[in-house]
A protein has these predicted regions:
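RNase H-like, metal-dependent nuclease domains and their acidic two-metal-ion catalytic environment used
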Residues: 1-77, 81, 85, 98-164
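Short, surface-exposed amphipathic charged segments that create phosphate/polyanion-binding patches used
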Residues: 85-94
Length: 164
């Protein structure tokens, strides 16, 4: 329904543990969408990835993100299946942390309400909305942020040289 735009964030540590949180959750009817492009452009130099699911309405921002110099990873359903599995595994194994509920109401609501849907026949799954009124975008955004942090080869701290 395109009424919310959500940005999740993930910090990956050297020991392959990670921390996720809901970074932004805004009403697009009030704030529009360009705020997200501007925010991501400011953060890009320190980011390892910006990830958008191919079925997300946020794909409409791809031209603006590309014009801002941001390399966007667009995921497919199998990427989502791997990402959801990784989030579940890391939570179970105690290698993924998150903020408490009081600072992340929308994320916690999405976690409580989301159901799962199968992806393919090999046991992969994705998050699903139980009804049209439930917004699970905070959970999806944090899941994709984790996926980007754990799979990206981009190192924003690496010095780079240009040869002409």
């Amino acid at each position: 329904e395109r009424t919310r735009l959500t940005i999740g964030a993930c910090m990956r540590y050297e020991d392959d543990t990670a921390h996720i949180e809901l970074a932004e959750y805004r009403d697009t009817r009030r704030d529009g969408t360009m705020w997200a492009v501007n925010l991501l452009a400011k953060a890009w130099d320190n980011a390892s990835a910006v990830v958008i699911d191919e079925q997300s309405p946020a794909t409409s921002l791809l031209p603006e993100l590309n014009n801002a110099g941001i390399q966007v990873t667009v995921t497919r359903s199998t990427d989502m299946g791997r990402a959801c599995g990784r989030l579940q595994d890391m939570l179970r194994d105690g290698t993924l942390t998150h903020l408490p509920e009081d600072g992340q109401h929308q994320l916690w609501h999405a976690v409580r309400k989301a159901t799962i849907r199968p992806i393919g026949k090999s046991g992969m799954f994705g998050w699903n909305r139980p009804d049209d009124d439930t917004d699970i975008s905070p959970l999806v955004a944090c899941t994709l942020a984790l996926h980007g942090a754990m799979t990206s080869q981009r190192d924003p701290t690496r010095q780079q040289e240009a040869w002409y």
